[in-house]
Amino acid sequence: MLRQLLVLVGLAVVCLADEHEHCCSEEDHRIVQKQWDILWRDTESSKIKIGFGRLLLTKLAKDIPDVNDLFKRVDIEHAEGPKFSAHALRILNGLDLAINLLDDPPALDAALDHLAHQHEVREGVQKAHFKKFGEILATGLPQVLDDYDALAWKSCLKGILTKISSRLNA
């Protein structure tokens, strides 16, 4: 019993000592990477990513209407069109990159820092948009993953989305 308590305390200390505001453990990122990989095994994975990305972004725009203005240059009015489809794929590819780098923290930090800078220079992008995007993912992923592990995904996605939105003021 004491041994289990010490292990739990040790894990808590590691999580609290981490420089990030999350604790995506090695086991968490292994679970997330495995489950994420299941989604993209199909030979038509780019089409699936585009469709999934469009669903996420149109849901985001529906839930936070001011997001529509941010996506005007990628033609959100024509969500099935090539410009918006390409943007949806870029976003899913960015998320794919981050998930695949979970086991390489220095590379992950560099990639997320780059994405943070890209969003920092876009006027109107807010931390709340990333929070809502995470919520949408958290409700959508269980619908497509049989063994969805909510705690692992929450731990890892929070770190990813927090880092990307870290340079935003609002």
From Swiss-Prot:
User: InterPro entries of this UniProt entry?
Assistant: Globin, Globin-like_sf, Globin/Proto, Haemoglobin_extracell, Mb-like_M
The primary site where this protein sits is: secreted
Q: Does the keyword Heme apply?
A: yes
Keywords (alphabetical) are: Disulfide bond, Heme, Iron, Metal-binding, Oxygen transport, Secreted, Signal, Transport
The positions annotated for binding heme b are H119
Q: Does the keyword Lipid biosynthesis apply?
A: no
Task: Say which domain of life the source belongs to.
Answer: Eukaryota
Localisation per UniProt entry:
Secreted
What Gene Ontology molecular-function terms does this entry list?
Answer: heme binding; iron ion binding; oxygen binding; oxygen carrier activity
Outline the extent of the Globin domain.
Answer: 23-169
Q: Which GO terms describe its cellular component?
A: extracellular region; hemoglobin complex
Q: Where is the signal peptide?
A: 1-17
Q: Which cysteines does the record link by disulfide bonds?
A: C24-C156
- Family to which the UniProt record says this protein belongs: Belongs to the globin family.
Subunit structure, interactors included: The extracellular hemoglobin of the earthworm consists of 12 subunits that have a hexagonal bilayer structure with a molecular weight near 3.8 million. Each one-twelfth subunit is composed primarily of disulfide linked trimers (chains A, B, and C) and monomers (chain D).
Q: Which PANTHER family match?
A: GLOBIN-LIKE PROTEIN
Its protein name is Extracellular globin-3
Q: Which organism is it from?
A: Lumbricus terrestris (Common earthworm)
Its organism's taxonomic lineage begins at: Eukaryota, Metazoa, Spiralia, Lophotrochozoa, Annelida
